[in-house]
């Protein structure tokens, strides 16, 4: 399973998260990447911790490199966590 597949699977298994295809975050100058909306009332730090645990449990390769540079933005009352190293 690739890192992108793992993110998609994890989000699909957890209703408090939602995929954001083609997100362009701060400093990306129009480049697009994969993002995840963490709904209001949920911690984006918990999302990251649990996502990395999910990847470890599923033996996902190259997770460190692909997750490097992950950032977040406010999205109304939600938060979007985005991964510039993962195309969208």
Report each predicted region and the residues it spans.
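Acidic, low-complexity, intrinsically disordered interaction modules
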Residues: 20-88
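Short amphipathic alpha-helix segments
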Residues: 2-16, 51-55
């Amino acid at each position: 399973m690739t890192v992108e597949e793992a993110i998609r699977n994890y989000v699909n298994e957890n209703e408090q998260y939602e995929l954001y295809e083609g997100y362009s975050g701060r400093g990306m100058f129009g480049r697009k990447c994969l993002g995840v909306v963490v709904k209001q009332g949920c911690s984006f730090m918990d999302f990251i911790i649990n996502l990395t645990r999910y990847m470890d449990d599923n033996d996902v390769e190259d997770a460190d490199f692909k997750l490097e540079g992950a950032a977040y933005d406010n999205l109304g009352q939600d938060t979007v966590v985005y991964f510039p190293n993962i195309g969208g």
